[in-house]
C-alpha cells in the first residue's frame, strides 16, 4: 500500500507543476498505525516531487484509542505538527451507541496528552445523537473548549442502512433521529463557538481566530484537492490553500 501511494505521488507530480503544497493531511481514520519512519518516507517523497512551502501544516488523523501518551510523544518528535482526533463525544453512552472503540476516559486522557505536546489540534464532535439533549451537547462542547482545541469539525449524526445502529433504532432500542433536536444542537454550537472565540469556516467547521487569520487571505479562490486512498473526502479548508495534499 505504501509503495503504491509513493508511486502515485511521483506519477502525479507533473499535474501540479507551478503549484505549492501548503498542507499535508494523512487521513482515513487510521494512519496513526503507521510508524514515524513510514510517515516520513511519504513526507520526504512529497518534498522531493513537489514544491512545499516553508513550515507547512502536516496533519495526522487518529482515533483516541490509537493515541497513547507514548505514541503522542513519538509523533511530536516527527514532522507531524497537527493532530486531528476523532473524539465524536465525551459521553460514554454516545460512544457505545456509535460503536466507537474508545470510551470517555480515553478521549479526555488522549486530549490531555495531545494538548501538552501539540499546539495545533482538531477534533471531531457529533451532534443529533439519539437521546442527546442540549445539556449533554453543552457538556461536550464545554469539555472541548476547556482543552483549548483550535479547530472543531462538527457533524450531525447520520444512520446508514444495514448498520448496527440502524437495526437498533428499528427495533426500538434507541429513539430515532430528531431533526428538530439536531437543529437546536447546531444553533447552540454556533452560540458557543462565538463565545469561545472560534470562527466558522464552513457550516459545522470551527477554527481559532489565529488559524483563521493565517488562511483567510486565500478564501474564495478555486483550489486543487488531491485525494489518495481515502474512504471519504475531507473538505476542511479546501478553499483556503494552494494544494491540499491528502494521504
Residues covered by each model-derived region:
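C-terminal scaffold of the Radical SAM
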Residues: 1-15, 19-247
Amino acid at each position: 500500500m505504501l509503495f503504491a501511494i509513493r508511486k502515485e505521488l511521483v506519477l502525479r507530480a507533473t499535474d501540479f507543476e507551478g503549484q505549492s503544497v501548503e498542507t499535508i493531511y494523512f487521513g482515513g481514520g487510521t494512519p496513526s498505525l503507521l510508524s514515524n519512519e513510514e510517515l516520513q518516507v511519504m513526507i520526504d517523497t512529497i518534498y522531493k516531487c513537489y514544491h512545499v512551502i516553508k513550515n507547512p501544516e502536516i496533519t495526522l488523523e487518529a482515533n483516541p484509542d490509537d493515541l497513547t501518551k507514548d505514541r503522542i510523544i513519538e509523533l511530536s518528535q516527527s514532522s507531524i505538527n497537527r493532530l486531528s482526533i476523532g473524539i465524536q463525544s465525551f459521553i460514554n453512552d454516545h460512544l457505545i451507541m456509535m460503536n466507537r472503540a474508545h470510551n470517555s476516559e480515553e478521549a479526555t486522557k488522549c486530549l490531555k496528552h495531545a494538548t501538552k505536546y501539540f499546539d495545533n489540534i482538531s477534533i471531531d464532535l457529533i451532534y443529533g445523537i439519539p437521546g442527546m439533549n442540549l445539556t449533554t451537547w453543552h457538556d461536550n462542547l464545554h469539555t472541548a473548549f476547556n482543552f483549548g482545541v483550535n479547530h472543531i469539525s462538527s457533524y450531525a449524526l447520520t444512520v446508514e442502512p444495514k448498520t448496527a445502529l440502524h437495526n437498533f433504532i428499528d427495533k426500538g432500542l434507541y429513539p430515532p433521529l430528531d431533526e428538530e433536536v439536531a437543529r437546536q444542537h447546531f444553533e447552540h454550537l454556533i452560540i458557543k463557538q462565538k463565545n469561545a472565540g472560534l470562527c466558522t469556516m464552513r457550516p459545522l467547521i470551527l477554527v481559532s481566530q489565529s488559524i483563521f487569520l493565517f488562511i483567510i487571505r486565500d478564501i474564495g479562490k478555486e483550489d486543487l484537492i488531491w485525494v489518495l486512498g481515502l474512504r471519504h473526502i475531507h473538505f476542511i479548508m479546501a478553499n483556503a490553500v494552494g494544494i491540499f495534499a491528502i494521504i
